[in-house]
Structures are given as structure tokens and as C-alpha cells.
Regions:
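ATP/NTP phosphate-donor binding region
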Residues: 1-16, 197
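Short acidic, glycine-rich surface-loop motifs adjacent to enzyme active sites
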Residues: 19-34, 176-188
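Short Gly/Thr/Asp-enriched flexible loops that form oxyanion-binding sites at enzyme active sites
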Residues: 27-49, 191-200
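Short, acidic/small-residue loops that bind anionic groups at enzyme active sites
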Residues: 37-69, 76-79, 204-213
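Internal gly/pro-rich beta-alpha loop/helix module
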Residues: 53-125
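Accessory alpha-helical/coil subdomains and C-terminal extensions
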Residues: 98-183, 188
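CN hydrolase (nitrilase-like) catalytic-core segments centered on the catalytic cysteine
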Residues: 182, 186-222
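Conserved small/polar residues in nucleotide/adenosyl-binding loops
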Residues: 224-226
Length: 226
């Protein structure tokens, strides 16, 4: 998966959803980067019609393959009128998850996709869709992002912090065309003293630096500024 595939996919989805004979779209996707694709589409699809991503954790030859039911549930979700205006969705193992909160939590478990910060939006049971909540986050038609005329995306890198991180892990990003750096810090997005000067240099060079956390739940508070 890469930016070019994402841009092509978003543009094609927007084109298809303009047709009155199409009520929703289901996208089969590998589970490794499904959450990334879902979130990208959640910000770039310009329709209130359902877009549902689905995959499988087990191969089709497994004794209890999860793919067939996941696909069925995804189609049911995309076809349900209740799924409109809920943003891009992920349908896995009976749950319906909002793209903005979907996280892959386990390497092999069929219940790997969860929403630890907000919970699932709903579920599918016996071919029927049930919603318990909606997201208040801006998405799709409310999003400020428009990729209609874009052929490439800015180059952004991720710095994963740890106890002994050194500045040379970050320095190459300052001179190789990066427009942004995401810092996955410890705790509340805290920045190691060894790389703080380099990230400060990045800001002075016009590179955007965004603090986040490697911790899976909870917000990252604005305690420091670079």
C-alpha cells in the first residue's frame, strides 16, 4: 500500500458514489494496513454513502475461516440505510468500527480490530445492522481535505521514540524532502532529550512536527511546543 494507491482509490470511490444506482461500496483489504487506508478515505471521500472496508485474519483454507462472514457483514453494512453519514467504516468479526478510531490490536486474533478509545459504532447480527452510537468527529463531506487535483502527497516520516533513541535517527529527515514528522513519543507524547534539538531544527526548517504517543489509548495533551 502507498500514497498512489490511496489517491487512485479515493478518486475512484468519489466518482462511483456520484452515480444514483450505487448506494455504497465495499473494499476488500489486507489487514496489515487496513486502518491506515480507512482513515485516509475517511478524510478524502466526499459522499455520505457508506464505504466499508473488510478483510480476513484467517486463510480461506482454515477450519474456521472468518473471511466469508466478514464479507457478508460488510455488504449488509454498506447496504443498510442506517450506515449513511457515519463516515468510512470497518466491518470485522461482527463489529462495525469508525475509521477514525479503528486499531489493529492483535497479530493473529479474529477480534483484532477494535476501537479502544471510543468503542464500536455498532454490530451485525444475523444479517441485521445495529448501531449504538455515532462519531462526532468530522469526516468525509465535512473534511477539509480534497485530493481531486492531487497526484502526490507530501512526504511525512514517523519517529518512534524509545529510551536510547539518538539524534541520528531523525537527522536524515531534515534534508531528504520531508514535509512533516510524526513523533510517536513515550507516555503523553513526551520527547527524549536526545532528539528534542533535532526536532526543533526541523521546525526552523519549516517541517511540521506533530506530537503523538506510542501508548494505544488516551489523548496527547499540549504540554510542550516545538
Amino acid at each position: 500500500m502507498n500514497d498512489q494507491v490511496w489517491l487512485t482509490l479515493a478518486k475512484k470511490i468519489n466518482e462511483l458514489l456520484k452515480r444514483p444506482d450505487i448506494d455504497g461500496i465495499v473494499i476488500t483489504h489486507g489487514t496489515d494496513t487496513m486502518e491506515e487506508t480507512a482513515y485516509f478515505l475517511n478524510l478524502t471521500v466526499k459522499s455520505n454513502k457508506p464505504v466499508v472496508l473488510v478483510g480476513a485474519m484467517r486463510p480461506s483454507t482454515a477450519l474456521s475461516a472468518d473471511g466469508p462472514l466478514n464479507l457478508y457483514n460488510a455488504v449488509v453494512t454498506a447496504a443498510a440505510k442506517e450506515s449513511k453519514d457515519k463516515g468510512v467504516l470497518v466491518a470485522m468479526n461482527g463489529l462495525i468500527l469508525g475509521a477514525q478510531s479503528t486499531v489493529k490490536m492483535n497479530t493473529v486474533d479474529v477480534q483484532t480490530f477494535q476501537a479502544p478509545n471510543s468503542g464500536a459504532l455498532g454490530y451485525v447480527l444475523n444479517g441485521k445492522v445495529f448501531y449504538n452510537q455515532v462519531t462526532l468527529k468530522k469526516h468525509t463531506t465535512q473534511s477539509v481535505f480534497d485530493v481531486t487535483h492531487l497526484n502526490a502527497l507530501p512526504k511525512v516520516g514517523i519517529v518512534y521514540s524509545y529510551s536510547n533513541i539518538e539524534a541520528d535517527m531523525v537527522t536524515p529527515m531534515l534534508n531528504n524532502g520531508y514535509k512533516g514528522i510524526i513523533h510517536a513519543g513515550v507516555g503523553n507524547g513526551n520527547i527524549h532529550q536526545n532528539i528534542f534539538p533535532v526536532l526543533t531544527d526541523a521546525r526552523q526548517k519549516g517541517i511540521l512536527v506533530v506530537r503523538s504517543s506510542r501508548v494505544p489509548t488516551g489523548p496527547t495533551l499540549s504540554l510542550i511546543h516545538i
